[in-house]
Regions:
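Metal-dependent enolase-superfamily TIM-barrel catalytic cores that perform enediolate-based chemistry
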Residues: 129-130, 134-220
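Structured beta-strand/loop patches that form or line metal/cofactor-binding pockets in enzymes
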Residues: 1-44, 48-49
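Residues at beta-strand starts and edge strands
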Residues: 29-31, 62, 131
Length: 220
């Protein structure tokens, strides 16, 4: 328990830039949560959002506001138990999980500022001195393997030494998926690490077949 109390809950939707570059971040909407407190300490959190459902997630946050005002933000575990078991009659779905994520992050942000320490210290201390950064290559909206490969090449030129791609799409043949991976590997060379995310779009037998075919391409 602490002397802190939440006094207001605000949301901010940041639309995508749509600058035509087709990068993941340029086509993604962001949803931020701001928790204000009686001690002048504000906490910020970012919600995971799904395309076309940003307003639904924001609405969940607004519905939770009446429960969050006057709530002690240090009681993060209590908040988790309550929201999963009691809010919305204890029947949470993906949109609610997205809303919860931003609120919880904002609570941790408040407590880090309150105790004047990085949040990782509140979670048990640091584990790594540094983390590997990789480029997340979106294939949404691309019409050809060459377009995907060109975007990957641009990311390597920016300094990334590892790229993750999503080569599968619903209804595509194994040959189409394989060609997309081959083109990206050719574009980024053998020194750059290449990762594959199936993202629930492949049937088990298709995933096994593709895995065998791309094995020589040095997939991380």
């Amino acid at each position: 328990m602490s002397e802190l109390k939440i006094t207001d809950v605000k949301t901010y939707i940041v639309p995508p830039s749509f600058d035509g570059k087709k990068r993941w971040c340029d086509n993604k909407t962001f949803l931020f949560v701001k928790l204000e407190t009686n001690k002048g300490i504000d906490g910020w959190g970012e919600c995971y959002v799904l395309r076309d459902r940003e307003r639904c997630i924001e609405l969940y946050i607004k519905e939770m506001k009446r429960y969050l005002v006057d709530f002690d933000p240090s009681r993060i575990k209590f908040f988790q138990d309550w929201v999963y078991n009691s809010f919305a009659e204890g029947r949470p779905g993906i949109d609610l999980f997205c809303a919860i994520s931003g609120i919880e992050i904002a609570m941790w942000d408040i407590m880090g500022k309150y105790y004047n320490t990085p949040v990782y210290n509140l979670l048990g201390g640091p584990v790594h001195d540094k983390l590997r950064l990789y480029a997340n290559l979106s294939t949404h909206g691309y019409k050809s393997p060459e377009e995907v490969a060109e975007q990957a090449k641009e990311m390597v030129a920016m300094g990334f030494t590892a790229v993750k791609m999503y080569p599968f799409d619903f209804g595509e043949s194994d040959d189409e998926v394989y060609e997309r991976v081959v083109k990206v590997r050719e574009a980024i060379g053998n020194e750059t690490e290449l990762m594959i995310d199936i993202w629930r779009k492949a049937q088990p037998d298709q995933a096994v077949n593709i895995a065998k075919r791309i094995e020589p391409l040095r997939i991380t």
